[in-house]
């Protein structure tokens, strides 16, 4: 090979390698370095063994609920004692969130026989099994004042379920590839991971009000501070949407792209979690990342009873972290 051509090829190769290296080390894939500390520096007030895995945290007025595998179950924790007080076995893996409403815990199940399990919140037993399947894993479920809401296919069919009959009372078409709903102030909000939008549906009429463009591939979402917050798996950002005018008011660089994760609201802060970066705090008053904890753990969380309840999915653990403690770090 002629020497000049060889040198040119080497130069091109080095340039491509440098570009790939730069892309791979981009801060957007490493979190926000300047505010990072080890997740192991946090001292939980309690850590509870849930099962083979632990996922989908739910806070109710008097309990914390979390799903497990090995066994397939939904466990109830008493926040006064941090003890498991009930283990409700279900037919398969709880794969698309947990919701509370109408005295019941609603549990979408994936696997060989996808269905929707209804748990009596007073008796801690399965009261009904509905032949209504979630659209996909990493989806969600929500309750409003009179209905249960769940997407049941990849085409964007939002089912409105009547809790008095356990039947579907309305089917609403939303953008395909939408899976995760949350209810807030009369509106059901659903993220569209395939279309990168957040869709607002009137919870009274079922009318689609608007689809708002947010960050790339939004999936998990939370309501708080007059806003809806979406965790965008495609670019690792968090989008803030004003509930009143349905406008994006902030796009926050968090640097946590990729599958899985969760997001919650509490202590006037937004709390995303993903593997590798188990916890991030965003100050809702400034839309700034204040602190980011890196290391093992994370994947699902909720705030309640003065605490963050966060799972270590892979180890099957649920930890309780006092908000008063974590807000000082």
Task: Give the location of each predicted region.
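Predominantly soluble domains enriched in secretory-pathway, periplasmic, or organellar proteins
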Residues: 13-329
